[in-house]
């Protein structure tokens, strides 16, 4: 009540320029009061569903610094998957899973009219809350808590008073990453971000809320849920230049206690969470990546930590995030940073550039948070896709996997539509009736790899060629306009002229792994080098305990080629005969990859050299 009275007094004295006040983001020392006026703005030809509470498109008008602002908003229809679920635990620790409806949600992306560089990430659940970029500057907006008033506060990041100025960091280290110099030499080959074209990819995410978070929010699952939705809506906005969508498929609350040992040692907690994901979560929930959100203060001022190149790996596609700020953009930036590591992005060096330094992959927290990825991040992500081929994000979900009611005229082909080519004025598809989103008379299809001149291609027509020995070509069925989902050769199928065996669509061989780690001239080291894995030493082992100082365990004699990988590096002035690579950030780096041939008829599985006929 006192807070409401202060706001009313402030508005009476300064109707357009606010005095210091506590808002959702914290204590704001300067803000402007605006009164957004809503104007419905459905796409041309679109029909609003009568049962919807939140429109698919909206428009708001207000003024900032005396300048008219027209904010166009479109619902983020890729924020949730259709099979979105929530799991919590009863007082007797029974697992309870529900599937709440999330189709009619209130989270939007947008832009400012007549500003091509503008962006916006807004929650419209109770007024407008979020941020927008106008004329290159980022503004925050949120409703003032005044009964029966449309008043909102608009302010900049620098107007938020930061209580904690101690430097904070990403927990990922880079002791053995590429040096600055090689990056510098390749900068001339880097394609500018605005010229890049990435195929659309989906990361299906599960967020786990640990017990410290449940306690912090006084067991208020609604508040936690809203907070996570707001953060992920902004994460999606950040990743738009990569054409990546982060779809929330599940939310889990550890109500009665943690299911792993969550400690302040970030590295140990991350490893434990990865092992739990591989042994538990993956067995009951389909997803690509999992995030543990905690309120436990992490060592070394760590805000987040993950495994570099970890995306799609069963025990490595995880991240640990500290809920350290009540500013949505701060949290979204940390999540985007850690997810970048999982996608192969390293910390930026002095040679990396973006529109306004620092960039998102800078190793320390930046105030205000960065808004752009660097040239290096784009280059590293592209190389990651080529090298690791992360299959879990390469295959997009089926249209029905993304939850949203169909809207005819929005140019998104959704469940229940035969086609959608936009408004009648904009449609250029000769097969589609833009007014109804139905196929025209005589047309069999309007989109898809197996659609040609409005007719479904004959059965057996190749629609996706085989990429390599471990891939298979896909062919049209004659019944559908869509190419069948990507399939691969069976595990254990010989590949690369019997140099290896197929494993989950790849042909992992030591030679290619050495080249990827060191240089194009690298080869596999002689057998004597692999005998070092019998030692159980710092650089020679098969398995190790969790943590930096974890004990190393030697390989059995028959398994020496399934532990650390040894290479002969023939690059200029090196000529190292038994070279291996170790990374504190990703302890799997430099280990012989699963499925690699270790002897004729044998492959590496769980760091053991086993018969290929019984391995799969």
From Swiss-Prot:
Residues 201-397 form the Peptidase M12B domain. Pfam families: ADAM_CR, Disintegrin, Pep_M12B_propep, Reprolysin. It is found in: Secreted. Its main location: secreted. PROSITE patterns: ADAM_MEPRO, DISINTEGRIN_1, DISINTEGRIN_2, ZINC_PROTEASE. Ca(2+) 1 binds at residues 204, 288, 392. Its EC number is 3.4.24.-. Zn(2+) binds at residues 337, 341, 347. Ca(2+) 3 binds at residues 471-472, 486. Ca(2+) 2 binds at residues 407, 410, 412, 414, 417, 420. Monomer. Belongs to the venom metalloproteinase (M12B) family. P-III subfamily. P-IIIa sub-subfamily. This is Zinc metalloproteinase-disintegrin-like ecarin. The lineage of its organism: Eukaryota, Metazoa, Chordata, Craniata, Vertebrata.
